[in-house]
Amino acid sequence: AWIDCPELGIHPGDAKYGVLADKDGVMFPCMETIHMPYIQEKKLPSVSLRPPSSGQLAYGVRTRDLEAPMQLIELLSGAVSEFLPGIVSISTPNDWSFCVRFSNDCQATFSHYGLERQVDKLEQALEHARQTHRKINAINLIPEHNVPVLFDGAYEDIPLAEPIEE
């Protein structure tokens, strides 16, 4: 994933001064000639970080703020489902949650713990929205029950064609 930290001048997709993170949450500087040919074809999500108190990002060591977002990226990259869209960006507004923006413009709030349960809830909600011809604008996946969902009121979906059995 790309790291986004505008306060430190780090922006996603910057081949010269960009920073990448691996699946374990270890950051490293982007090396244009080495990394760009491999990642140019992939649409890597970006993870926004608040600037550390030291004023510098730590390379080569596991970063706690990246652990859950990178675990979620890994979980969703292995999920095969027609309902799960791709991750565009992840932001961390506070210490107990992070927000994910998906390619279908849905925004989901996750807790750092119980990601598998939250991904299951997201998949169920997206499937239900599709079956009822609605689009989810925002969903908070932190509660275990009664997950709050905000639907797009302006969204018009053409009903799905249902096969007729003869």
Enumerate the language-model features and the residues they cover.
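Charged, solvent-exposed interaction patches on well-folded alpha/beta domains
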Residues: 1-166
